[in-house]
Amino acid sequence: YYVDIFRSRKVEGGDKMHDYFYHNMGQTMNLTAADGSSLFLQPTEELAFAGAHIYAYSYLFDKKSAETSKDIKTTFTIQMPDEDNISMNMWMKGAPERKVFSALSPMTEGLSRIPDMPYAIKEQPTLTFVARQQGEAWNRPFVAVYEPSSVKEPGCISSVTFPEVESGVAGSHVGICIQQKEGRVDRIISSDDAGHLCKSGEMTVQAAYALWGNKQGDDCIF
């Protein structure tokens, strides 16, 4: 799996919003709460021109959105001719004052030149996920975990949660707990300052990024 922690803010303050984009190949995209419940996405024009100051946003279409502070999960699926469908599974930490969007972007021209692609790239818009954070996105960063899988090679992750991190110093501290199907648990802590002492559950670290893997009581990675 892959971990993406994206912090963003204006140095001078006065942040209006910060947007996180992710594009993936495929014909279908399913955006729900992390527990699988519906977010009740509704059609929207909110992304159009990004409030009249980013005109490239006008290329997005079929936009739907929901305002939610819940953790979410998005699955992008390539429907393969041999039915061994390939998926990219994304879990993202929720935050107050956040909106999530599903949308379509223009097709990906470069990939259309690759031979033996599983579907007609030029005829398929690009699946697009957007998360919009009102205000700063430094102390409320975009935190995502990505895992590819297929029908014949299912993913290893059974759940992703985002436990709170305690620290005696104010800062952008992130906790991630990744439970795998074979019993391994990976705990991750990230801080915007490697000098800050951070604690989450049984894990205490002083680092910008630290991972502790444990399988059935045995430490397997630090």
Regions found by a protein language model. Give the residues of each.
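Acidic (Asp/Glu-rich), glycine- and aromatic
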Residues: 5-45
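Trp/Gly-enriched beta-strand surface patches
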Residues: 41-123
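C-terminal substrate/ligand-recognition segments
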Residues: 1-4, 8-13, 141-142, 146
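Short amphipathic beta-strand/extended segments with alternating polar/hydrophobic composition
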Residues: 19-21, 87-94, 101-105, 183-195, ...
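Generic recognition of flexible, low-complexity loop/linker segments
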Residues: 5, 60-62, 75, 118, ...
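A structural signal for short secondary-structure junctions
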Residues: 9-16, 23-24, 121-125, 134-139, ...
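Non-catalytic terminal regions with compositionally biased, polar/charged low complexity
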Residues: 129-140, 146-222
